[in-house]
């Protein structure tokens, strides 16, 4: 379970970096703002998840070294939606941790909405 959690946390922290790159390179003000809200928010909620997990199950001992830099923000956020949905079942089922995963999913979903539909 710890390996699944460390991959989950690492992927989400990498998403902050990736969306920061998109934030800097977009020509759209609405996308610029949505991506900025995302990378600020995802670090905070990922940190909350990691600390809650470690408080209950112990410290992480390793993290994956793989890093992927995506090319297109909407497709990337949609892939994060699928990642969180798939990973959820392999993560601890404690309600407090699942609630934090809900917050993560909510942030990804609202950012995807803003990128797709707000101009």
Where are these regions (language model features)?
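Acidic/histidine-rich alpha-helical segments that form the ligand environment
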Residues: 65-116
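Amphipathic alpha-helical coiled-coil segments
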Residues: 48-53, 111-119
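Residue-level recognition of alpha-helical structural elements
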Residues: 8, 31, 93-97
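Helix-loop segments that flank and shape redox-cofactor active sites
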Residues: 14-36
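Disorder-to-helix initiation segments
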Residues: 1-9, 15, 73
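Conserved alpha-helical segments that form or flank metal/cofactor-binding pockets of metalloenzymes
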Residues: 32-60
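Non-transmembrane amphipathic alpha-helical segments
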Residues: 19, 49, 84-87
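Short, charged, low-complexity loops and linkers
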Residues: 1-4, 61-68
């Amino acid at each position: 379970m710890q390996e699944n959690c460390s991959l989950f946390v690492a992927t989400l922290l990498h998403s902050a970096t990736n969306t920061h790159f998109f934030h800097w390179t977009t020509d759209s003000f609405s996308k610029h703002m949505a991506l900025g809200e995302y990378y600020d928010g995802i670090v905070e909620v990922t940190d909350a998840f990691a600390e809650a997990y470690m408080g209950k199950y112990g410290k992480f001992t390793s993290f994956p070294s793989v890093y992927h830099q995506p090319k297109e923000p909407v497709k990337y956020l949609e892939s994060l939606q699928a990642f969180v949905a798939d990973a959820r079942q392999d993560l601890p089922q404690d309600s407090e941790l699942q609630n934090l995963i809900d917050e993560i999913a909510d942030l990804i979903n609202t950012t995807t909405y803003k990128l797709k539909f707000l101009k």
